[in-house]
């Protein structure tokens, strides 16, 4: 179809940001901003009523689109028609967000024939989306999501030029045929609207069908899993179970819904008479309060919530409700709601397991939240990856729902068979009961299912156990046949990183195949089209990167090696950079050709084999090709840009306005991906008028949130000068906080948090009182205050945050709301910021100071906190006379004295649970035969 365009009045058309305009309708009038529903209602009533010649901004056949919409309105009714219209509009906004990331916003000259052809494709794409969703339903959205997955698969397969017809022709319209630019379009799939009711129903049906099917693992896997867990616990977990502060949430539980107060209301009803210590209390009092709280939690498992709550039967503690949570990406997540006591007690196990998980090199950066550093350090100490390896980006479907119970029990048995690693008064059967149940699930449609496989997403222990099981699969994949990857015989590095069910690994093809086999044997199912292998591209937790080949010279030196069961030979090498001479020699490290999992290498103690001593010799080879980390993709996530987030991090309940949430979301994405230019362009197009709204309320829109500003992003990023985004009054207060206050931190950012959480505000006030006490000393990091009775409490940030977080329970039990019942107004936040700007001692900042340097100073460690013991303070108060201090308060106060709690009701005794058998030399032949039967071949030697 040829478009008739009046070139005298219209010479250029920009990419349409409005879906109806993309179908050829007239552009929306510049009226005052209204709500989303009202705006859509006005738009579609306008375009349906106007004559064709008036409802057209450029030459386009609008009449057929309007007729299809009218038919859809008559067939569906007004309510369903509007829902589908909003669904299509959200899909188009996801496409527009990806388009806005480009350096130049696309426009089409109507005097150029190729440009008119590209514009016609835009109109066809908009009509396909709008009319398809309204008339055919949600299958069009699923097709768009599959197109994004197919485009990513094409990029990972190594294509150097992407076909122009990809993603409904959008690649050709924009001219983004390079893999780097086309990668941004694949993030449209994760930014699609929330899952619809049909998506939720399908997710619930799949969840019930999966959990109701019993599954078992091969016995050889169970033996290996228990040995792995026991070795991992011995190497990483503390010898004794630790007690942690009670986690406070307003999430729903079996006793109380979220509207009724949730888990916090259960604390108030169950902890009657419990008086926790205030955040300003002495360190010893806080430790005693934690022990008292843990005792109440342990007692609540069998008494408090079963008899004082709404659950009347002891068996009902294994009851759980199923809830569906729609997510962006047109999908839905299934979660479960459990009794408050089990959730609270499970958090103790979760934090104990995380103490050991964070010590593993593949998980330490992930637990710390630095996923980019986790990937960048994959190439190890040498910066080398074997040349015959491939990047595996694993993606599992319903990973936690498909894990067999016997495999989970083997892992738990290996970890908690030692009584010292369990909470006082608990048995191994109690651990099984807490983690696995078996739980009886109640679905929203009234159906009921007893769980026969899988670990539920509503329990705190699920994610740590998923990490351990995934780590077990990875370690077991070391059984794959190893081979030299060079004629000289040396073996370079392999590496991997884990985050729950996400895996990124650089492995030889044999190990990838064995990992896939092990995971499938243990019940896993890989996502079709998302479980990717590539020689160049990798993706880990939605962060895309590349690796690059590098040629290096390698020196090989033979070493004495262990012969026998597994180890046949090993090599050590050091590398020299080529080019203009030698730039450095790296330290040598042994790499084994025949590899075993680390947890199995203890076999050397019982089967030492024989050592063959040789005279070390050195050989130099030609430069070989190895791989290193390349660079991060410039693509950014788009979920935050489609619609303003309604919640902030750490505040999962309260609904907040866009001026409150867009700034932190944009700053987080820009800082994580170092793409300040792309984020600023998306902000300017997707949220027009937001900077003006913040500035009119007296809030600097482009000042970081830690300094009290709106948190929006400029294209200059961290190099932006403070004088360009803040007035002298703001710079004076920020300079005082950073350079003249005791904390050396800006306190303006707390105003935003205090406006949403009264409990946080009360806890923060108590901690500030504690830090101002005369017996609290702040020194530089690793410095001693040179006082005899000073006790180190830790770094300032750790002490401050732990006391504030632990004090939220104290504030909540004393009547403070965890979150405000209403959203804060912009005028309220503005007034609080103006009051906080008062600075009695003044301050100074150069207007040319970069924002990045100021943020860096704000995040610097502030030193070590020391506490003067009571003997020192009493001696000081009494003039140095050295009188004895008053006696300490008796232990067990607060009504906690009494006999120990009875054993848990309805649980099996510990003696009935099989325990792990220690590995002995007599078991060697049986173990070898079992492994041969499992893999169909003898282990590599």
Curated annotation (Swiss-Prot):
The yes or no answer to whether the keyword Ribonucleoprotein is present is: yes
Q: Supply the InterPro entries for this chain.
A: DNA/RNA_pol_sf (IPR043502)
Give its E.C. classification number: 2.7.7.48
GO MF entries: RNA binding; RNA-directed RNA polymerase activity
Root EC class: transferase
Reaction(s) catalysed (UniProt annotation) = RNA(n) + a ribonucleoside 5'-triphosphate = RNA(n+1) + diphosphate
Give the location in the cell: Host cytoplasm
- The UniProt regions of compositional bias labelled Low complexity, in chain numbering, are 905-918
One Gene Ontology cellular component annotation held by this UniProt entry: ribonucleoprotein complex
UniProt keywords, alphabetically: Host cytoplasm, Nucleotidyltransferase, Ribonucleoprotein, RNA-binding, RNA-directed RNA polymerase, Transferase, Viral RNA replication
Region of interest (Disordered), residue spans: 875-918
Function in brief: RNA-directed RNA polymerase that replicates the viral (+) and (-) genome.
Q: What else is known?
A: Yeast strains also contain a double-stranded RNA (dsRNA) called T. The (+)-strand of T is identical to the single-stranded 23S RNA. The T dsRNA seems to be a by-product of the viral RNA replication cycle.
What does the record note on quaternary structure?
Forms a ribonucleoprotein complex with the 23S RNA, where a single polymerase molecule binds to a single viral RNA genome. Since the viral RNA is not encapsidated, ribonucleoprotein complex formation appears to be the strategy to survive in the host as persistent virus.
Protein name, please?
A: RNA-directed RNA polymerase
Q: Please name the source species.
A: Saccharomyces 23S RNA narnavirus (ScNV-23S)
């Amino acid at each position: 179809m040829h478009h008739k365009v009046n070139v005298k009045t219209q010479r250029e058309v920009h990419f349409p940001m409005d879906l109806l305009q993309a179908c050829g309708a007239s552009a929306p009038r510049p009226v005052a901003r209204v709500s989303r529903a009202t705006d859509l209602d006005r738009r579609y009533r306008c375009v349906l009523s106007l004559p064709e010649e008036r409802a057209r901004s450029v030459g386009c056949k609008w009449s057929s689109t309007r007729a299809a919409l009218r038919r859809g309105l008559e067939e569906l009714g007004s309510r369903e028609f509007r829902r589908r219209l909003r669904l299509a509009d959200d899909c188009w906004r996801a496409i527009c967000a990806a388009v806005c990331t480009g350096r130049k916003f696309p426009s089409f000259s109507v005097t150029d024939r190729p440009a008119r052809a590209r514009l016609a494709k835009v109109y066809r794409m908009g009509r396909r989306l709008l009319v398809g969703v309204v008339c055919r339903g949600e299958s069009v959205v699923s097709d768009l999501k599959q197109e994004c997955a197919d485009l990513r698969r094409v990029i990972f397969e190594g294509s150097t030029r992407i076909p122009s017809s990809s993603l409904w022709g959008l690649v050709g319209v924009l001219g983004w045929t390079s893999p780097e630019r086309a990668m941004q379009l694949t993030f449209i799939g994760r930014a699609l609207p929330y899952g619809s009711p049909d998506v939720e129903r399908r997710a619930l049906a799949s969840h019930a069908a999966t959990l109701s099917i019993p599954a078992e693992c091969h016995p050889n896997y169970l033996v290996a899993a228990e040995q792995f867990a026991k070795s991992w616990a011995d190497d990483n977990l503390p010898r004794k179970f630790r007690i942690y502060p009670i986690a406070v949430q307003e999430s729903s539980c079996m006793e109380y819904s979220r509207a009724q107060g949730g888990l916090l209301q259960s604390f108030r009803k169950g902890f009657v008479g419990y008086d926790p210590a205030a955040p300003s209390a002495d360190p010893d009092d806080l430790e005693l309060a934690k022990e008292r709280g843990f005792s109440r939690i342990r007692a609540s498992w069998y008494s408090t919530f079963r008899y004082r709550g709404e659950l009347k039967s002891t068996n009902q503690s294994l009851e759980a409700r199923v809830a569906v949570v729609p997510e962006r990406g047109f999908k839905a997540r299934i979660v479960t709601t459990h009794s408050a006591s089990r959730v609270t007690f499970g958090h103790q196990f979760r934090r104990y397991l995380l103490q050991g998980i964070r010590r593993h090199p593949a998980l330490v950066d992930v637990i710390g939240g630095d996923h980019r550093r986790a990937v960048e350090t994959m190439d190890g100490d040498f910066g080398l990856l074997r040349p015959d390896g491939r990047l595996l980006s694993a993606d599992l479907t319903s990973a936690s729902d498909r894990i067999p119970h016997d495999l989970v029990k083997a892992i738990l048995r290996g970890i908690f068979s030692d009584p010292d690693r369990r909470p006082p008064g608990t048995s191994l059967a109690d651990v099984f009961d807490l983690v696995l149940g078996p739980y009886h699930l109640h679905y929203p449609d009234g159906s009921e299912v007893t769980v026969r496989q899988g670990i539920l997403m509503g329990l705190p222990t699920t994610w740590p156990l998923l990490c351990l099981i995934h780590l077990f699969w990875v370690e077991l994949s070391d059984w794959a046949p190893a081979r030299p990857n060079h004629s000289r015989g040396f073996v370079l590095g392999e590496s991997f990183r884990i985050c729950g069910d996400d895996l990124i690994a650089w492995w030889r093809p044999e190990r990838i195949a064995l990992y896939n086999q092990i995971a499938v044997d243990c019940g896993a199912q890989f996502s079709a089209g998302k479980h990717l292998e590539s020689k160049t591209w990798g993706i880990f937790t939605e962060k895309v990167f590349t690796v690059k080949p590098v040629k290096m010279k390698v020196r090989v030196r033979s070493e004495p090696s262990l012969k026998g069961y597994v180890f046949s030979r090993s090599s050590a090498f050091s590398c020299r950079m080529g080019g203009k001479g030698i730039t450095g020699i790296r330290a040598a490290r042994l790499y084994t050709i025949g590899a075993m999992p680390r947890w199995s290498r203890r076999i050397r103690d019982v089967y030492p084999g024989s050592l063959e001593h040789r005279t070390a010799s050195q050989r130099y080879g030609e430069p070989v090709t190895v791989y290193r980390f390349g660079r991060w993709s410039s693509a950014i996530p788009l979920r935050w840009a489609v619609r303003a987030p309604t919640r902030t991090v750490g505040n999962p309940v309260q609904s907040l306005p866009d001026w409150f949430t867009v700034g932190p979301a944009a700053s987080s994405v820009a800082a994580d991906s170092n793409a300040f230019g792309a984020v600023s362009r998306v902000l300017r197009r997707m949220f027009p008028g937001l900077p003006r709204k913040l500035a009119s309320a007296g809030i600097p829109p482009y000042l970081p949130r830690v300094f009290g500003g709106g948190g929006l992003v400029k294209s200059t990023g961290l190099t932006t000068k403070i004088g360009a985004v803040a007035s002298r009054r703001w710079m004076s207060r920020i300079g005082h906080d950073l350079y003249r206050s005791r904390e050396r931190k800006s306190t303006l950012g707390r105003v935003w948090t205090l406006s949403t959480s009264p409990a946080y505000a009360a806890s923060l006030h108590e901690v500030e009182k504690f830090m101002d006490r005369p017996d609290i000393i702040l020194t530089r990091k690793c410095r001693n205050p040179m006082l005899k009775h000073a006790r180190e409490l830790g770094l300032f940030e750790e002490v401050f945050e732990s006391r504030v977080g632990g004090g939220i329970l104290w504030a909540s039990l004393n009547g403070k709301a965890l979150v405000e019942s209403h959203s804060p107004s912009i005028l309220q936040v503005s007034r609080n910021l103006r009051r906080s700007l008062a600075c009695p001692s003044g301050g100074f900042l150069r207007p040319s100071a970069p924002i990045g340097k100021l943020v860096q100073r704000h995040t610097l460690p502030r030193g070590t906190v020391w506490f003067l013991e009571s003997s020192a303070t009493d001696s000081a108060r009494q003039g140095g006379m050295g009188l004895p201090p008053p006696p300490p308060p008796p232990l067990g106060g607060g009504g906690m004295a009494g006999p120990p709690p009875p054993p848990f009701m309805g649980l099996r005794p510990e003696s009935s649970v099989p325990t792990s058998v220690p590995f002995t030399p007599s078991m060697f032949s049986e173990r070898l035969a079992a492994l041969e039967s499992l893999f169909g071949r003898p282990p590599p030697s």
